[in-house]
C-alpha cells in the first residue's frame, strides 16, 4: 500500500500493538468483519501503519476483545512476542470519548493510580478509535498484558513509581534502538545541528532516557539532548562540536557505570553497577559490613536506602564526582579539548539528589 509502512524492519512500540488490537475489537462491536491487518493513522505528517493482529471476537453485554502480538523488531527486547489483549465496551456519553482503564499487567502510576501511558499512546488511540464511534456512544478501552506483571519486574518501572505492570510509554511508533549504530548516527546529527545553531551558547545537557528528559525540563536545564546509551561517543562528538559546558544528567543506576569506566550503558553490553558502588564505598570509608550490604543489594537504589542519610549523601556526592573525573579521562583519550563535564544524579523518585563539583560550578551555582 502506498504511503504505509509494515512493522517488519524497525519494529513497533507497545502502544502501536495496543491501538491495533483496540481497533480490531471496535470493528467487531460495529459488526464489521475481522480484519487481520489494521491500518493506523499517525497523523497528516506521518505514513500510516499496517499492523497485524491475531484475532478479535465479541463478548457479552456490548463488549469485544482484540489480540495482537508485539514485534519490537531486531535486537533484544523483553516485549518480543508479548500477547496484547484489549477489551472494549460501549459507554453512554453525549459525545464520543475514550475511557482508558489499566487491565492486568498494565502499569499504573501508584497502586490506585491512572493507567501509565504516554501522550503518543493516548493520541494514537484517540486518532484511530474516535472517528469510528457512533453518535451518543463512548468507548471503554482496557489494555491487558497477561505477562506484563512478571515482565515489569525485569524493568526499572518501579523505580519511577509505575506499579502492577508495563508502562505504555513509547513516544513514537518505531522502536528506537538505544544500543544500535543507527540511533547513534541520529543523535550525532542532532548534536551537529544544535551546535551549528546561531543561538547555541556552548552549554548542553545530555540525558539517557525519557525520565532524564522530563526532569531536565522540570528543572529548567537545557538545551537537552537525549543520547540513549551511547554516552562515550557523544561526549567526544560534543567536544568536537565546540560544546564548552556539558552536564550529564541521569538516574544513579545508569550513570554509576561511567564511574566504572563503562561508557556504553546498555545493560546487555556491560553491568558491574554494584561492584562499582562497593569500590566507591571503600573510597568513602564504609565499613566491611556496609560494603557487604551494598554488594548484596538488589539494586543501586536499595543499596543507598540501606545506608544512613549521611553515608548515602557522602557516597552519592563521591559517585557524582567520580563520574565527572572518569568522563574527563575518557575524553582525554581522544583529544585535548577544554570542554568541562559535570554530572548530576537523580533517584527512583526522580528527585535530583547529588551533583559533582563541576556541575555545581557550571550548572547549579545559583540554585537553592
From Swiss-Prot:
It holds the Pfam family CbiD. It catalyses: Co-precorrin-5B + S-adenosyl-L-methionine = Co-precorrin-6A + S-adenosyl-L-homocysteine. Keywords: Cobalamin biosynthesis, Methyltransferase, S-adenosyl-L-methionine, Transferase. It is an enzyme of class 2 (transferase). The keyword Mitochondrion does not apply. Its EC number is 2.1.1.195. InterPro entries: CbiD, CbiD_sf. The keyword Lyase does not apply. Pathway: Cofactor biosynthesis; adenosylcobalamin biosynthesis; cob(II)yrinate a,c-diamide from sirohydrochlorin (anaerobic route): step 6/10. One of its GO terms (biological process) is anaerobic cobalamin biosynthetic process. Disulfide bonds: none annotated. GO terms for molecular function: cobalt-precorrin-5B C1-methyltransferase activity. PANTHER family: COBALT-PRECORRIN-5B C(1)-METHYLTRANSFERASE. Belongs to the CbiD family. This is Cobalt-precorrin-5B C(1)-methyltransferase. The lineage of its organism: Bacteria, Bacillati, Cyanobacteriota, Cyanophyceae, Synechococcales. The gene is cbiD.
